[in-house]
């Protein structure tokens, strides 16, 4: 009789012990943490260059991803400056630190980078193309869920070129 009770009790205890085990999956990193590269958004902008020959400047930017944190962004861009002298052509790569997170009414940022600069008569100019260091200050104003207005200042080439921009930028949802 004891062996019958033991035979019934052992499988019952084992079933309860197995049911009591709880699966704990490994923690999953949120998509906002760490490095994330890819085309996450783009923007268009226009403005003026207040150097000696004031030029009208048009450009496009790409949001190429985050480095180390969701607040540090990689941003390549291209620009064309027209009127008042030779047309200028600029390709830039900048790193921008955003002081607030996503979804704020205003998002200030600052950063820097470098530009490869040319102009219409670059072939005849021994100093062309040139490399400039950039300082960037700006902020985005929330417009729609994935669109922001952009207001920005660029000090370029040792602050010999001071550019002010206004534009519209988008970022794909996280």
What are these model-derived regions, one by one?
Residues 31-33, 47-51, 82-85, 122-128, ...:
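Outer-membrane beta-barrel domain signature
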Residues 44-48, 60-64, 93-97, 112-114, ...:
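Residues on the lipid-exposed face of transmembrane beta-strands in outer-membrane beta-barrel proteins
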Residues 160-174:
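Outer-membrane beta-barrel "beta-signal"
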Residues 32-48, 108-110:
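Transmembrane beta-strand segments of Gram-negative outer membrane beta-barrel proteins
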Residues 1-32, 174:
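Cleavable N-terminal export/targeting peptides
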Residues 38-40, 52-58, 87-91, 106, ...:
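Residues that define the transmembrane beta-barrel architecture of outer-membrane proteins
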Residues 150-156:
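C-terminal binding/interaction regions
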Residues 58-124, 143-145:
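Gram-negative (and chloroplast) outer-membrane scaffold detector with strong preference
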